[in-house]
Amino acid sequence: MMKRIPAILVLEDGAYYKGWSFQQDKQEITIGEVVFNTGMTGYQEIITDPSYFHQIVAFTYPEIGNTGINNQDIESHSISIKGLIAKNICKISSSWREQQSLVKYLSSNNIPFIFGIDTRSLTQYLRQFGTMNGCISTDNLNHSYLKQKICEIPSMQGLDLIPHVTTRNVYPWDEKSFPNWYLTDNIRVHRVIQLKVIVIDFGVKLNILRRLATLGCQITVVPAHTPLKDILAYQPDGILLSNGPGDPSAVHYGIQTVTNLLDYNVPIFGICMGHQILNLALKAKTFKLKFGHRGINHPSGLNQQVEITSQNHGFAVELTSVFESPVRVTHFNLNDTTIAGTGHNQSPYFSVQYHPESSPGPHDADYLFESFIEIMTKSKNKVS
């Protein structure tokens, strides 16, 4: 039986919360940006999502871990978060798909976690004062000392975290969505023309790749630093700019690559970080949100059409800057009216701030992958 030990969460402004953790082989202090996610389900997908790199995630739902961990519901091949915060972590999980408990999964990967704190109070605090750096510690419980340690770490603004999560090597991808991912077999699969898609990996979620493969695309994933000439050498029918962590304005090499790609009129689809990088390349600007959008029930839409979407980002495209660029707004976040999607007025470029691949979350926006297929097909037919 794992031994319960005292733990503490400290925020950079000095606020702190006392709770509990379990004894791990390696006791240490972990520091990262403290954010909250409002999803009731999908904790496994969340903690393995590379977009959460360098972040300590607080789950607002009062208990997580009930269904354990399995080898399918992962969005990368390692845990991405720096730490986990919960009101309660279920120690006796149950699911026919379970292969290990959440506690064992976190402990075996030396991911610090704290439970037994008032996560509602913490969430309200972050909403009022904004997301900020913080730490979880079981090694040293002196909050004054820990506050000093936190202040040594830079804030998320200005951080380029892509080198930590992008692939080091080019690789093909052909794994499709799991058979039970859809409740219907009525899925259009485009097999007449096999479209070549280059995915620029800023921290791509695996289900983005699965959705493209399911629709019959020939996928090649390339590192974020890949030179333009190497990308064009594949003669792609389309470019997908993936999700990823950090401040998009700090990813200068990615912005420059996309800026140069615009000269070739190759269809581009941006998701989350990719959305921000595409808009920065189109001369728009981004800014840091006070506490971000992280959850699986965010309404997005325009002109009386609404999609319930999965979102995970701390930055957004500045609305006034879009008016000075060649794009139009296609979606707004209906909670705070920030931009949730844009499209180019003349060229085949479009992007969304949310996750159409869900995992976790609803499938309302999955049609965007179909839209990408249609845009690539039309563009390919024009060339031929």
Curated annotation (Swiss-Prot):
GO (cellular component) term, any one: chloroplast
Stretches assigned to the Glutamine amidotransferase type-1 domain: 196-382
Functional description taken from the UniProt entry: Small subunit of the glutamine-dependent carbamoyl phosphate synthetase (CPSase). CPSase catalyzes the formation of carbamoyl phosphate from the ammonia moiety of glutamine, carbonate, and phosphate donated by ATP, constituting the first step of 2 biosynthetic pathways, one leading to arginine and/or urea and the other to pyrimidine nucleotides. The small subunit (glutamine amidotransferase) binds and cleaves glutamine to supply the large subunit with the substrate ammonia.
UniProt KW Membrane keyword: no
Protein name: Carbamoyl phosphate synthase small chain
Amino acids binding L-glutamine: 51, 244, 246, 273, 276, 312, 314-315
Binding partners and assembly: Composed of two chains; the small (or glutamine) chain promotes the hydrolysis of glutamine to ammonia, which is used by the large (or ammonia) chain to synthesize carbamoyl phosphate. Tetramer of heterodimers (alpha,beta)4.
Active site per database record: 272 (nucleophile), 355, 357
EC number(s) given by UniProt: 6.3.5.5
Family that this chain belongs to: Belongs to the CarA family.
Domain of life: Eukaryota
Keyword entries, A-Z: Amino-acid biosynthesis, Arginine biosynthesis, ATP-binding, Chloroplast, Glutamine amidotransferase, Ligase, Nucleotide-binding, Plastid, Pyrimidine biosynthesis
Pfam family, one: CPSase_sm_chain
